[in-house]
Amino acid sequence: MKLFRILDPFTLSLITVVLLASFFPARGDFVPFFENLTTAAIALLFFMHGAKLSREAIIAGGGHWRLHLWVMCSTFVLFPILGVLFAWWKPVNVDPMLYSGFLYLCILPATVQSAIAFTSMAGGNVAAAVCSASASSLLGIFLSPLLVGLVMNVHGAGGSLEQVGKIMLQLLLPFVLGHLSRPWIGDWVSRNKKWIAKTDQTSILLVVYTAFSEAVVNGIWHKVGWGSLLFIVVVSCVLLAIVIVINVFMARRLGFNKADEITIVFCGSKKSLANGIPMANILFPTSVIGMMVLPLMIFHQIQLMVCAVLARRYKRQTEQLQAQQESSANKA
């Protein structure tokens, strides 16, 4: 019972979805169905975010260059440095491909939809999150293969215009359309914030189920032993904890407010499964792809669960701060 008090309903939903995908993964004709459903849910998420953000908020988010600069440093400098140090150290005798997999994980761009959804759930700066996460994903398509070639001795990799177009079509276009629709649906969106919050959560659950179903079908539980699996889980938790702590420290050190701190934490600590697996298919031989992306797949699940708990905690802090401000205003 104590566990259920610690974990919020959304975190329990994530665990349930992972178990569901492990025992009942999407197969056959259901695979394209869930892929299309996930795409539609993500597009709806960004449409709603565009509709509920004012023009002034978007301009302010895009112009928040100090925040964006630190998020990029966290994603493409801090993470790779930690990955290189860990791969050089090799503290445990496991398959060397697992160390390469963690190094590859650290080079990837940030995930977009969950970073923005968690920022929204926690009461952070959503406009800045949209700009930072989208920019990270777009830059990563070009920068990540270059970093792979630099630190992993893989050559002949380059960015894919098709992936750039997919990001523009699936994420930025719905956001722009939603914002352009704001004069007609803005009031309705304001009255239905709880329903929109459910849209955020549902999109994340669909991504988790679809991604983990594919991993299970590809034999994730048959490729590694329990010892290696425990190694991946522990390293993923430690890596994520280090990055989150550094991001919180730097956000406060640089003088960001609470909303911006939330954005930095959720945008600067994520790694993209959606970009990482297709990129691995291009960069690495087929025979090693499974082991290379295994740390990424497990890290992806852990980051979602950890960030769900963090989002709940930040939301409670944000609500308390707002209540204090309202109380002070009423007294004045």
Describe every region a protein language model picked out.
Residues 24-38, 52, 63, 270-295:
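Transmembrane helix-boundary motif of multi-pass solute transporters/channels
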Residues 193-199, 256-272, 278-279:
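Helix-helix packing/entry segments at the starts of transmembrane helices
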